[in-house]
Amino acid sequence: MASDQHRPKPRLSLRSSTTIRYGSMSSEHPDGDPSTPQTTSISQRRSYIAVAVLCYINLLNYMDRYTIAGVLLRIQKFFFISDSTSGLLQTVFICSFMFLAPVFGYLGDRYDRKLIMIVGLVMWIVTTLGSSFVRKSHFWVLVATRALVGTGEASYSTIAPTIIGDLFAGSKRTLMISFFYIFIPVGSGLGYIIGATVADATGDWRWALRVSPALGGLGLLLLVFLIPNPPRGASDNGGANMETTSYTEDIKYLLKNRSFVWSSLGVTAMAFVTGALAFWTPTFLSRAQVTQGLKQPCKEEPCDSVDSYIFGAITVVTGVVGVFLGTCISKKLRDRVPNADPLICAVGMLSSSPCFFIAIVLASTSIPATYTFIAIGETLLSLNWAILADILLYVVVPNRRATAEALQIMVCHLLGDAGSPYLIGAISDSLSKYNTTDPSWDFRRLEYSVLLCPFIGVLGGLFFLMTSLYIKEDRKAAELLTSGQTPQPEITTVSESV
């Protein structure tokens, strides 16, 4: 029997072929059997601890991301800035996050993933803490440091899900991924609450930006000592000892993977909606209450933070409930309905859009009704978080997952939440000139701006319906390639080729 070092290794290739759709496993092995699977000595206990640590850091990432939104009114009064300029704070963060995600995706598929995350987390802690010392005359410093914060987060967000994917397989992977993504809404909600609480307690919004870096120091220690670096594809039949391919080949593979493309477009629409609403909802609801005469407008700090508290609590609760429901529904339907996952995502997007539309329209007359429909809409939207991550992991081969995560992040932020907060603010500012005398116009112009979000949500639902048409085929192809087999070519009929 040949020794392992002389055994030929299968290689993923994306060179053009008339028979294979998304790539091939080429091997010189005469019978086509895959190489001996890689094994990993990582215990289940250590794997669970690793997921807990990754969840904790994910929580901190999203806490920091939405702390700014929780104290936005204070920032506007502190720097005397407009809506569009305020939206720029989120846009520059997302832009740096977006453009550097492909870089870290490339590195994550080729180099030590744990080391990359450590470097990124250190950068995030330093820049986040630095942004809290900005002075009133240096708004541009806050903008610059928020951009650098995105650099640190990009390294973590592209790599952490792939490590979970290599520690677990099957339904257990789905469960672990759902735990990881539960902390997106939980962290976001806590960002509003903790940001507003710390700002109220200290009388200075800048102290709110110092909470996440302090907790991040603990996260860094946990990352260094408790996170393993499993072999890529270790949970998927050992990964069949896949060799690294070129970045160009990886991109070609992903662009030919229709489930990945359509689901990425769906994620983009979802990012547009969540990014815009998450950033502007507390400010929007505060202006709605001023219009109804329920409270006085904020002229200078400190501003009333009650809307940040309520919206933060709603985000936490609905996020946990939505992710849990989405995961349970997926596990129950997946075996019977092969395309259940994208269908659940489509239902979540299409049903949440009317809820958000009604909530926006009712804001001028009933705040309780508005909060009710926001809660329903956020629950329906949160059905998608864990499912979307699982879709990417099972339709993409292991040695291209970090690149896939990075490419999806870049696209969804480029066309989604990188521009949506700024776009909403810019539309609101552009409408201000049409009515300069009515005090309620500050609310109305923002209301008309955020009404764009439900329509983008409907578009996202249609993208997920398209994903459902191809998910079964693409998942099977990825499973075959991962196990060292070649996907069977599709039979093309005469009518299809004409």
Swiss-Prot record:
GO terms for molecular function: transmembrane transporter activity. Disulfide bonds: none annotated. The chain crosses the membrane at residues 49-71, 87-107, 114-134, 148-168, 175-195, 207-227, 260-280, 309-329, 343-363, 373-393, 407-427, 451-471. It is found in: Membrane. It is a multi-pass membrane protein. Pfam families: MFS_1. One of its GO terms (cellular component) is membrane. SUPFAM superfamilies: MFS general substrate transporter. CDD domains: MFS_spinster_like. Keywords: Lipid transport, Membrane, Transmembrane, Transmembrane helix, Transport. GO terms for biological process: lipid transport. InterPro entries: MFS (IPR011701), MFS_dom (IPR020846), MFS_spinster-like (IPR044770), MFS_trans_sf (IPR036259). Its main location: membrane. It comes from the Eukaryota. Sphingolipid transporter. Belongs to the major facilitator superfamily. Spinster (TC 2.A.1.49) family. This is Protein spinster homolog 3. The lineage of its organism: Eukaryota, Metazoa, Chordata, Craniata, Vertebrata. The gene is spns3.
